[in-house]
Curated annotation (Swiss-Prot):
<dbReference type="InterPro" id="IPR017039">
    <property type="entry name" value="Virul_fac_BrkB"/>
</dbReference>
<feature type="transmembrane region" description="Helical">
    <location>
        <begin position="235"/>
        <end position="255"/>
    </location>
</feature>
<keyword id="KW-1133">Transmembrane helix</keyword>
<feature type="transmembrane region" description="Helical">
    <location>
        <begin position="23"/>
        <end position="43"/>
    </location>
</feature>
<keyword id="KW-0812">Transmembrane</keyword>
<keyword id="KW-0540">Nuclease</keyword>
<keyword id="KW-0378">Hydrolase</keyword>
<dbReference type="GO" id="GO:0005886">
    <property type="term" value="C:plasma membrane"/>
</dbReference>
<feature type="transmembrane region" description="Helical">
    <location>
        <begin position="199"/>
        <end position="219"/>
    </location>
</feature>
<keyword id="KW-0269">Exonuclease</keyword>
<dbReference type="Pfam" id="PF03631">
    <property type="entry name" value="Virul_fac_BrkB"/>
</dbReference>
<dbReference type="GO" id="GO:0004527">
    <property type="term" value="F:exonuclease activity"/>
</dbReference>
<keyword id="KW-1003">Cell membrane</keyword>
<feature type="transmembrane region" description="Helical">
    <location>
        <begin position="172"/>
        <end position="192"/>
    </location>
</feature>
<keyword id="KW-0472">Membrane</keyword>
<feature type="transmembrane region" description="Helical">
    <location>
        <begin position="126"/>
        <end position="146"/>
    </location>
</feature>
<feature type="transmembrane region" description="Helical">
    <location>
        <begin position="83"/>
        <end position="103"/>
    </location>
</feature>
Length: 275
């Protein structure tokens, strides 16, 4: 059986569409707690709310982005400072629900049962959520400080304007690298199976490139051809957001299925699940 045919067969057998819809649902529920947790941390960094939202804006459809910005600003403005500590914990717990759904989907891809305890699985999801937040924050800080770092390096080594141009391209090329790191971490840590980084890179690269392409094309389609606000009214932004999350879920699951299929075809010694 060809690789693509077997991949499609596994995706269908593992109910990939249903799993993608489940991921979209939990992504939507987790989005704003995730943003609130991340924006709380930016209070201690030279970053603004707009800097954080700008990362999402690179990929999110415009109609969905306006909804995200509106709800995020409203939530932050109405936040009770006295409940901040509890709010951070609650936001982190809620945001980890999205990661929890990914854990279940990737276990399904590898045909492994989840025999880790509820606490271990939840802590894994929380760890992945925190890791994603800090990875995104690093990506945000690089453009902020990157220009000054580039100038200092240029003065030190006596480089030309070409160096500054290349450095600028590197700084603004951080987003794909961040995505690759996030997807790689997901595929290594999330499944109940011991996996090394080199065995998950094919799926991580696929998910990274696919997500950038699909997000860009979907954003172009929504802004050019489809007017969801005219069709669905005030919930148009939510519909667009759910479709975007659904497409993202498909790519994440396909990336996991690619890794699982390659793992199976290479007939590697099967590692025992965590106990």
């Amino acid at each position: 059986m060809s690789f693509l045919k077997e991949l499609f067969s596994r995706y269908t057998l593992h109910e990939g569409q249903s799993k993608s819809a489940e991921l979209a649902y939990f992504f939507l529920l987790s989005l704003f707690p995730f943003l609130i947790f991340m924006l709380t941390l930016t209070a201690y960094l030279p970053l603004s709310t707009d800097d954080v939202l700008g990362v999402i804006e690179q990929y999110a459809p415009a109609s969905a982005m306006s909804l995200v910005e509106s709800i995020t600003h409203q939530t932050l403005n109405n936040r009770n400072g006295g409940l901040l500590s509890f709010g951070i914990i609650a936001a982190l717990w809620s945001a980890s629900n999205g990661m929890n759904a990914i854990v279940r989907s990737l276990n399904h891809a590898y045909d492994v049962e989840e025999n880790r305890s509820f606490i271990i699985v939840r802590l894994t999801s929380i760890f992945l959520t925190i890791a994603m937040v800090f990875t995104i924050l690093v990506a945000l800080l690089l453009p902020v400080f990157g220009r000054e770092i580039g100038r200092l390096a240029s003065d030190f080594v006596g480089a030309s304007d070409l160096f500054l141009s290349v450095w600028a391209a590197i700084r603004w090329g951080v987003s794909p690298l961040v995505l690759l790191i996030v997807f790689s971490a997901l595929y290594v840590i999330a499944p109940n199976k011991k996996l090394s980084l080199r065995f998950v890179m094919p799926g991580a690269v696929f998910a990274t490139i696919g997500w950038i392409i699909v997000s860009t094309l979907f954003s172009f389609y929504v802004s050019t051809f489809a007017n969801y606000s005219a069709t669905y009214g005030s919930i148009g932004g939510i519909i667009v957001l759910m479709i975007w999350f659904y497409l993202s879920g498909i790519l994440i699951i396909l990336g996991g299925e690619i890794n699982a299929l390659l793992h199976k075809r290479k007939k590697l010694p099967d590692e025992n699940p965590y106990h």
